[in-house]
Amino acid sequence: MSLTRKRGFYKQDINKTAWELPKTYLAPAHVGSGAYGAVCSAIDKRTGEKVAIKKLSRPFQSEIFAKRAYRELLLLKHMHHENVIGLLDVFTPASSLRSFHDFYLVMPFMQTDLQKIMGMEFSEDKVQYLVYQMLKGLKYIHSAGIVHRDLKPGNLAVNEDCELKILDFGLARHTDTEMTGYVVTRWYRAPEVILSWMHYNQTVDIWSVGCIMAEMLTGKTLFKGKDYLDQLTQILKVTGVPGAEFVQKLKDKAAKSYIQSLPQSPKKDFTQLFPRASPQAADLLDKMLELDVDKRLTAAQALAHPFFEPFRDPEEETEAQQPFDDALEHEKLSVDEWKQHIYKEISNFSPIARKDSRRRSGMKLQ
């Protein structure tokens, strides 16, 4: 056996890729892969639980990849909330920094995501329960000083009992970091992100929740723009073209003159726009799909909306114990330096028992 590898690991080809796993994880099976890594499911023999294991794709290929891998590890480590995906374990088969090339993230296994089931009929109580969980997760994330910025149905994992977790913090950034306009899938993207037209904050995620909730209620994507301008046009058809008070908040001159060139129009009546929704659901959507970020609901305000009364438990609407601190966010480090930081994080990691909710809704997805 190679002295550069740890004992207690075994090799297995999964979907034409070599994986090296500790013997505590049994029956690995391919789940999916994307630009930044592949995921397999496995059984943790210590608990009997099914877990998801992510192998990052070439994490040390470049400074950008290495920094991204470090940030993903740190963010997952920071998350301790039942509606946010967090880290159960992290490991590397390497026994020293010199032989360290790959590492694996272990997370709770989730059966599907909202994207895959968006075509199904959602009853209003299912919408209540799922959106309530999205907002609980966001309240927690936002309290840590993090904006998700990429919230869309594919980033919302669900189990058959309607339990939901927010995924994918690869593109999340600290609120006080300069934000760029190319993040959320366009259809779920807040208008202030599309145009970078004004300062924006954590309520970009609330806009995304509004778009997702509307789609769950109607079975159709609310703002299905073909490009940026078409996206904005579709949004303004619903929100109305704003007046002078809003326009003077815009920092971007081109956006200012474009909005001023349009004839002013009122906001649509959301009870007419969503005829199948209850008045409370329409009212919540109206307040989440607010053009002015200063008037849009925060996650905490949205949770207090009467729409969630049947499921609400304020004790479960927890905040992060401390803000997320990524002291290296602005550092320009070499691949080797990022590698050292990641190796140290892995070596120092001690798993924390994750507590999920005491109560269950009794609902089933299908």
Swiss-Prot record:
GO terms for cellular component: nucleoplasm. A motif (TXY) lies at residues 180-182. Pfam families: Pkinase. The keyword Nucleotide-binding applies. The modification Phosphotyrosine is found at residue 182. The active site is at 150 (proton acceptor). Activated by phosphorylation on threonine and tyrosine by dual specificity kinases, MAP2K3/MKK3, MAP2K6/MKK6, MAP2K4/MKK4 and MAP2K7/MKK7. Activation by ultraviolet radiation, hyperosmotic shock, anisomycin or by TNF-alpha is mediated by MAP2K3/MKK3. Inhibited by dual specificity phosphatase DUSP1. Its cofactor is Mg(2+). It catalyses: L-seryl-[protein] + ATP = O-phospho-L-seryl-[protein] + ADP + H(+); L-threonyl-[protein] + ATP = O-phospho-L-threonyl-[protein] + ADP + H(+). PROSITE patterns: MAPK, PROTEIN_KINASE_ATP, PROTEIN_KINASE_DOM. GO terms for biological process: cellular response to anisomycin; cellular response to hydrogen peroxide; cellular response to interleukin-1; cellular response to sodium arsenite; cellular response to sorbitol; cellular response to UV; positive regulation of inflammatory response; positive regulation of interleukin-6 production. The modification Phosphoserine is found at residue 350. Its EC number is 2.7.11.24. The TXY motif contains the threonine and tyrosine residues whose phosphorylation activates the MAP kinases. Serine/threonine kinase which acts as an essential component of the MAP kinase signal transduction pathway. MAPK13 is one of the four p38 MAPKs which play an important role in the cascades of cellular responses evoked by extracellular stimuli such as pro-inflammatory cytokines or physical stress leading to direct activation of transcription factors such as ELK1 and ATF2. Accordingly, p38 MAPKs phosphorylate a broad range of proteins and it has been estimated that they may have approximately 200 to 300 substrates each. MAPK13 is one of the less studied p38 MAPK isoforms. Belongs to the protein kinase superfamily. CMGC Ser/Thr protein kinase family. MAP kinase subfamily. This is Mitogen-activated protein kinase 13.
